[in-house]
């Protein structure tokens, strides 16, 4: 038995990790109103993306990997001698990535594809990838890995803040926000992932209060966990994320693992300006 681990590009793993563990990536893409399309790899730097999004008349659209892209990756790994592939995907609540990866797995012969819905995005999705790789190295079988990830999902989540809900509403990536329409003038929304979907949690007066709310909600959840990994996931307001990261490093118990990452273009397109996330995992994830 030989097991590969792959994911889509919204896990936002560093290139060092991708190279070290030979992780295959199925890229999502973004398209702007001028027709220019970029796959989520090295085709567009995140700073350039935010600048282009700010100057566009409409929000960019995003596309999941085509089934054919998944099939090509699966067949390549099969031809390299892999018998099983663990595939970690962006939440099915905001993307068709999981469904297309699963369907592609049904169409490929000679290799067993095990698609897993992270129900999250960004580096919290990436934590599932790193956990799966660790378990492969320890000799676990595919179903044992999927079972462990499923258990881990019960103690994993994320809260988000954005400047406004415009991008999320126009892209259809937020659930249950209708009652908030027209009520957010001078207010900042606090959001969370719930069962794979982004839903409104609270609205507060200032961005400072929103960040404090983000921190309090997550720390209240993890306070009884035996192990904790926290990820600050930053958007285009760089100083906000850096300040939160530094504060958590200073204030959290010594046993907490606090890490930092950034949103890539696809998730940033949905969140819009001012996105900032704080994710948590009830495990100590190997991050190197």
UniProtKB/Swiss-Prot annotation:
MF (Gene Ontology): lipid binding
Superkingdom of the organism of origin: Bacteria
PROSITE patterns reported in the protein's UniProt record: DEGV
UniProt entry keywords in alphabetical sequence: Lipid-binding
Pfam families, sorted: DegV
Domain DegV as annotated: residue spans: 3-282
RNA-binding among keywords: no
UniProt cross-references to SUPFAM superfamilies, sorted A to Z: DAK1/DegV-like
Binding site residues for hexadecanoate: 62, 95
Job of this protein: May bind long-chain fatty acids, such as palmitate, and may play a role in lipid transport or fatty acid metabolism.
Name under which the protein is recorded: DegV domain-containing protein
Lineage: Bacteria, Bacillati, Bacillota, Bacilli, Bacillales
């Amino acid at each position: 038995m030989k097991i590969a681990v792959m994911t889509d590009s919204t896990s936002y793993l560093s290139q060092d990790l991708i190279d070290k563990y030979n992780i295959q990536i199925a890229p999502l893409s973004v398209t702007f109103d001028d027709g220019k399309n970029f796959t989520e790899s090295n085709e567009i730097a995140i700073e350039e993306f935010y600048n282009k999004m700010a100057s566009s008349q409409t929000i960019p659209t995003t596309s999941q990997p085509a089934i054919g892209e998944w099939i090509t990756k699966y067949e390549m790994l099969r031809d390299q001698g892999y018998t099983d592939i663990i595939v970690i995907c962006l939440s099915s609540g905001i993307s068709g990535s999981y469904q297309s990866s699963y369907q592609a797995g049904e169409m490929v012969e000679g290799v067993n594809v095990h698609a897993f819905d992270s129900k999250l995005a960004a580096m919290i999705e990436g934590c599932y990838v790193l956990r799966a790789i660790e378990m492969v190295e320890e000799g676990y079988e595919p179903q044992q890995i999927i079972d462990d990830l499923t258990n881990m999902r019960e103690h994993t989540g994320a809260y988000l803040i954005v400047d406004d809900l415009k991008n999320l509403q126009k892209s259809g990536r937020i659930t249950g926000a209708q009652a908030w329409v027209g009520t957010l003038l001078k207010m900042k929304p606090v959001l969370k992932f719930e069962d794979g979907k982004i839903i409104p949690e609270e609205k507060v007066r200032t961005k400072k209060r929103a960040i404090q709310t983000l921190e309090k909600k997550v720390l209240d959840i993890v306070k009884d966990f035996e192990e904790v990994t926290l990820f600050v996931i930053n958007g285009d307001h760089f100083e906000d994320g850096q300040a939160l990261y530094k504060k958590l490093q200073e204030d959290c118990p010594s046993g907490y693992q606090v890490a930092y990452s950034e949103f890539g273009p696809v998730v940033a397109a949905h969140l819009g300006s001012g996105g900032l996330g704080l994710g948590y995992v009830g495990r100590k994830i190997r991050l190197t």
